[in-house]
């Protein structure tokens, strides 16, 4: 029995790129392939709509939190695509999602972009908004020498926008914010950027302006920003924080990456039964093991804790690559056949750029030394314990 005989493999080979969301084929792929965990339907999507619907109260900017590759850009892209084109509502493969997003469908114009790191946030934001305004013949110019507050200028910009498009709102979306803020903090400029974030969030209240961005972790709790804690609290008051949870990532793995019929689940359940005595939690969590098979449930939990290597931490892409290697293999009756998080280190070792990170190089050099000693002194399945310890060491230095 091969892996591909007991599940439907739908690989995720790339994360959503904002700069391609204007391409129709790309849009349809993003709309059709979105997976809807219950938490998205119960909380995340309703919160988006609440903060976007015209005439709402206490509306704020939107901060979407999730590790690399967990679907932040896909989630924001989905909302934007429906908001800018009502026809896209019918392309959603979930009836409840269509009902939730009906109030915002086709109500907005959208400008999305990825942050460059060589300028101040206000200069970048006003440049991008100006580019949008000029392309739509909206009569407003930002003055870089203006003494008006950020909020005043945003208000004037929206007034000009609504003069031209009275029935539309305006969404400004940034793909990733955290790395930009970290670099600004390193250069001593963070405190000048936080008032801009505050103003952008505040501009969303009782207007048709929506500002959203993605981050890998809450900017308020990032330890490198705590020297600006007072200002961060003011920023926090202006944003809704929508977090993609570990359970949501597991759901995407189950329903899109490694989907299974009930008959296939029964086969997997029978395959795993002989191994339950060897896993402390398998008996009580057999359905979790079955639904995620062949991924060990602890893989996702440990994977997201590793803070090294941006591209390597794209969990859905990483699992796609790892399963692609074994999909045509026979499943041994003598082994559970699980993808465990120790295999992740092997993949990282193949990335030459990782050696530029001194922490990773230290772990790598130590592992090679231990490997050599074990190879020369022991026999049998002894290296697997070392592989297990490798990502554990990375967790301690992340």
Task: Walk through the language-model features, giving the residues of each.
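Single conserved hydrophobic/aromatic residue that forms the stacking wall/gate
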Residues: 386-387, 391-398
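Flexible phosphate/Mg2+-sensing switch loops adjacent to catalytic phosphate-binding sites
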Residues: 58, 80-109, 137-152, 223
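Conserved P-loop NTPase catalytic core
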Residues: 99-109, 114-119, 198-330
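Walker A/P-loop-proximal flanking segment of P-loop NTPase domains
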Residues: 1-70, 82-83, 230-246, 250-260
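P-loop NTPase catalytic cores that bind/hydrolyze ATP
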Residues: 77, 123, 168, 172-175, ...
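Walker A/P-loop
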Residues: 73
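Conserved P-loop NTPase "ATPase switch" module shared by AAA+ and STAND
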Residues: 162-190
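Conserved P-loop NTPase mechanochemical-coupling segment
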Residues: 109-152, 178-187
């Amino acid at each position: 029995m091969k892996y591909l005989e007991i599940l439907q493999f739908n690989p995720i080979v790339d994360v959503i790129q904002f700069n391609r969301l204007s391409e129709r084929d790309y849009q349809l792929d993003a709309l059709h392939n979105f997976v809807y965990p219950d938490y998205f339907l119960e909380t995340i999507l309703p919160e988006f709509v609440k903060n976007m619907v015209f005439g709402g109260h206490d509306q704020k900017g939107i901060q979407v939190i999730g590790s690399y590759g967990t679907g932040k850009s896909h989630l924001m892209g989905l909302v934007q695509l429906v908001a800018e084109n009502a026809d896209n509502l019918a392309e959603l493969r979930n009836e409840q999602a269509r009902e939730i997003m009906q109030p915002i469908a086709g109500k907005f114009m959208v400008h999305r972009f990825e942050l460059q790191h060589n300028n101040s946030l206000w200069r970048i934001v006003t440049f991008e908004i100006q580019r949008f305004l000029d392309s739509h013949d909206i009569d407003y110019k930002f003055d870089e020498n203006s003494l008006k507050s950020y909020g005043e200028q945003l208000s004037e910009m929206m007034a000009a926008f609504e003069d031209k498009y009275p029935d539309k709102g305006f969404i400004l979306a940034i793909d990733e914010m955290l790395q930009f803020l970290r670099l600004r903090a390193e250069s001593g400029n963070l405190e000048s950027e936080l008032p801009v974030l505050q103003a952008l969030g505040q501009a969303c209240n009782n207007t048709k302006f929506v500002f959203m961005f993605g981050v890998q972790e809450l900017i308020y709790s990032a330890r490198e920003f705590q020297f600006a804690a007072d200002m961060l609290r003011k920023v926090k008051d202006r944003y809704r924080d929508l977090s993609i949870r570990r359970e949501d990532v597991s759901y995407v793995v189950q329903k899109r990456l490694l989907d299974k019929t009930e008959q296939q689940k029964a086969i997997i359940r029978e395959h795993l039964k002989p191994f339950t005595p060897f896993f402390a939690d398998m008996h009580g969590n057999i359905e979790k093991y079955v639904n995620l098979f062949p991924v060990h449930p602890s893989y996702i939990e440990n994977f997201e804790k590793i803070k090294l290597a941006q591209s390597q931490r794209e969990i859905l892409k990483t699992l796609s690559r790892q399963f692609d290697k074994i999909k045509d293999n026979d499943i041994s009756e003598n082994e559970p056949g699980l993808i465990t998080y120790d295999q992740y280190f092997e993949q990282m070792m193949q990335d030459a750029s990782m050696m530029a990170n001194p922490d990773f190089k230290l772990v790598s050099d130590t592992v090679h030394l231990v490997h050599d000693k074990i190879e020369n002194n022991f026999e049998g399945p002894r290296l697997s314990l070392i592989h297990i310890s490798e990502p554990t060491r990375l967790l301690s230095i992340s």
